[in-house]
Every structure is written in C-alpha cells, then in structure tokens.
From Swiss-Prot:
This is Elongation factor P. CDD domains: S1_EF-P_repeat_1, S1_EF-P_repeat_2. Keywords: Cytoplasm, Elongation factor, Protein biosynthesis. It is found in: Cytoplasm. The keyword tRNA-binding does not apply. One of its GO terms (biological process) is peptide biosynthetic process. Pathway: Protein biosynthesis; polypeptide chain elongation. GO terms for molecular function: translation elongation factor activity. InterPro entries: Elong-fact-P_C, NA-bd_OB-fold, Rib_uL2_dom2, Transl_elong_fac_P/YeiP, Transl_elong_KOW-like, Transl_elong_P/YeiP_cen, Transl_elong_P/YeiP_CS, Transl_elongation_fac_P. Involved in peptide bond synthesis. Stimulates efficient translation and peptide-bond synthesis on native or reconstituted 70S ribosomes in vitro. Probably functions indirectly by altering the affinity of the ribosome for aminoacyl-tRNA, thus increasing their reactivity as acceptors for peptidyl transferase.
Length: 188
C-alpha cells in the first residue's frame, strides 16, 4: 500500500525497485528554507546492505504489510538461527544479519516475536529482559560500598556490563536486552 514518506517509521518494511527494506531510522527534516524531506536509513532484507534515501515528505512510498508471530528459539548453526512456530511446529531459518547483535541474548526455548513478509523473516523482537549469570567480576573492597558506582562484569553470554558492588561471581542477574544494562538480581 502506498503511503507518504513522512509517515514511515523505524521497523516498517518498504519495497523499492522490487526489493524489500527494513527501516532502521526515519527522520523528518524541516529546513528553515526549502522543502521538508524524510531521511530514511534502511537495510535490504535479502543481503543486509544498508542504504540511505532522502524523499520529499509528500512522495509516495510502497509500504509492505508484515505479520508478527511468536516463535521458539531452537539452536544456531553456520547458516543462521533456527526457530519453531509452537502452534504448527514449522521451523524457520533466520539469517545472522537479521538477528544482529541481539544474538548474544538468545537462549534455548526462548519465545521471540518474528516479523515475516510471506515466509521471509524481516526482524526479530526479544523479550525486554533476560536472566544471565555473572562469570567474572572484581571482588568488593571494604569501604567501596558507600558509593553507588558500578563495577565491570562479564556475563555467561560474553557480554560486558556494569553491576552494583554487592554482585559476585555466580550471581544470576536480570539485564535489559536492548542495551545490556543491569536491571536487578534474579529472584530464582
């Protein structure tokens, strides 16, 4: 369906020159003098190439409808990441460039939302929080607990983050998948 360029948002899928693109960033620019434009940065779904386009805000762009479904993460192999539809038990292979940096937070049997166009995976949305174990961090030195500073820690998925001084090696913590920041100590 055709929409005006100024209505395109991050996460939308658009078709251009017969190819599908996921919008990475979309910004409407209104210069003091001249025509307002929409600056859109997008990633081609077929091969992951990023391009940047500039449209007049009134230009027509072909927006593609996508379907969002829950899938269960199974495993990773050299081809990509394998997910299963829990209702139909159909498996789908998601390329590594679609998952991107979120791959570090994928855990076996985790439920994620996959956005699909026909049968092609377009994007993935992980749960906001995951529970991970601290595998390496500095020991607490006496008198250091008075300040509210964070100390560096390495998690079981290899990601580095900052944790409060009372967190030790072996402690399970909850982190935000968006930026890897510490949220709280796990309650389990």
């Amino acid at each position: 369906m055709k929409v005006i360029a100024s209505s395109i948002r991050k996460g939308n899928v658009i078709e251009q020159d017969g190819k599908l693109y996921v919008v990475v960033t979309a910004e409407n620019i209104h210069p003091g003098k001249g025509t307002p434009v929409s600056q859109i940065e997008m990633r081609r779904i077929s091969d992951g190439v990023k391009i940047s386009e500039r449209y007049k805000t009134t230009d027509q762009v072909e927006k593609v409808t996508i379907e969002e479904r829950n899938y269960t993460y199974l495993y990773e192999d050299p081809d990509g990441f394998h997910f299963m539809n829990p209702e139909t038990y159909d498996q789908v292979l998601v390329p590594k460039d679609v998952v991107g940096s979120q791959a570090a937070y994928l855990q076996e049997n985790m439920t994620v939302k996959l956005s699909m166009h026909d049968v092609v995976p377009v994007s993935i949305a992980l749960p906001q929080r995951v529970t991970l174990e601290v595998v390496d961090t500095e020991p607490v030195t006496k008198g250091q607990t008075a300040s509210s500073s964070y100390k560096p820690a390495v998690l079981s998925n290899g990601v580095r983050t900052g944790v409060p001084p009372h967190i030790t090696v072996g402690t399970r913590i909850v982190v935000m998948t968006e930026d890897g920041s510490y949220c709280e100590r796990a309650k389990d």
